[in-house]
Amino acid sequence: MFWTRYAGASILLFLMLIHLGQVYPRNDMTNFGCEECKLKENNIFSKPGAPVYQCMGCCFSRAYPTPLRSKKTMLVPKNITSEATCCVAKEVKRVLVNDVKLVNHTDCHCSTCYYHKS
C-alpha cells in the first residue's frame, strides 16, 4: 500500500514538472525583468513639448572564479572576477530646462561601466 502512494505521488510530481516546462517560454531568461538598453523619457525633467531622455536598461554581466595566475598578480587577491557593460549614452545634447543645465541622451549602447573603474 505504501509503495502505491509513493509511486502515485512521484508520477504526479513528474507530470507537474512537465507541465511547468511547457508553460514557461523557452527564451533566454538571464535578463528576466530587465529590458534592453534604450532611450526612455525622464518624467522628472521632461516638460510638455520638451522631452528629456536618458539611457536605461540592461546589458551584459557575468562573474567567474579568478584564474590562479591572475590571483598571484593582485595586490588584494579576490576569488571572484566580474565583467560588465552598462547602458550608457552614445550621443548627448546639452539642454536648458527651468534654468537647469541637463544632458539629454540621444543614442544609447552597452559600453564600459564607468562606476566600476577605480
Swiss-Prot record:
Glycosylation sites recorded in the entry for this protein: 79, 104
PROSITE patterns on file: GLYCO_HORMONE_ALPHA_1, GLYCO_HORMONE_ALPHA_2, GLYCO_HORMONE_ALPHA_3
Tell me if Disulfide bond is a UniProt keyword of this record: yes
Glycoprotein listed as a keyword: yes
Q: Which GO annotations describe the biological process of this protein? A: G protein-coupled receptor signaling pathway; positive regulation of steroid biosynthetic process; regulation of signaling receptor activity; thyroid hormone generation
Q: Which residues form the signal peptide?
A: 1-23
Task: List the keywords (alphabetical).
Answer: Disulfide bond, Glycoprotein, Hormone, Secreted, Signal
S-S bridge residues: 34-58, 37-87, 55-108, 59-110, 86-113
Superkingdom field:
Eukaryota
Q: Which GO terms describe its molecular function?
A: follicle-stimulating hormone activity
Q: Which GO terms describe its cellular component?
A: extracellular space; follicle-stimulating hormone complex
Localization, per the record, is: Secreted
Q: What does this protein do?
A: Shared alpha chain of heterodimeric glycoprotein hormones. These hormones bind specific receptors on target cells that in turn activate downstream signaling pathways. Involved in gametogenesis and steroidogenesis.
- Describe the family membership recorded for this protein in Swiss-Prot or TrEMBL: Belongs to the glycoprotein hormones subunit alpha family.
Q: How does it assemble?
A: Heterodimer. Glycoprotein hormones are heterodimers composed of a common alpha chain described here and a unique beta chain which confers their biological specificity to the different hormones.
Protein name stated in the entry: Glycoprotein hormones alpha chain
> Species name for this entry?
Ctenopharyngodon idella
